[in-house]
Amino acid sequence: MTVYSLTETTGNAGCYGVFSSEEKATAAAMEFIKSWEYENAEETIFDGFHKCIYYGEPDAYGNCGCFEIWKHELDAT
């Protein structure tokens, strides 16, 4: 079974859910970003097991918000 976890690794750090597809995890990330009133989001390309969605304006150190989507293969036994 394949699942995709959605985590935020910066100011709003935490796990935001587990989804059945990368597309559903991406849609959820975009909804969180929109609800936090950020207007910009930039996705990296999903490389088969991971992608990032950056949002917000960079701070003084060049850091902005980041959601990460990770692919997990679970053993059904």
Spans of features found by a protein language model:
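A short, charged, amphipathic alpha-helix used as a generic interaction element across diverse proteins
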Residues: 8-10, 20-43
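Short, solvent-exposed polar/charged micro-motifs at secondary-structure junctions
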Residues: 16-17, 56
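Short, mixed-charge low-complexity intrinsically disordered segments
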Residues: 31-77
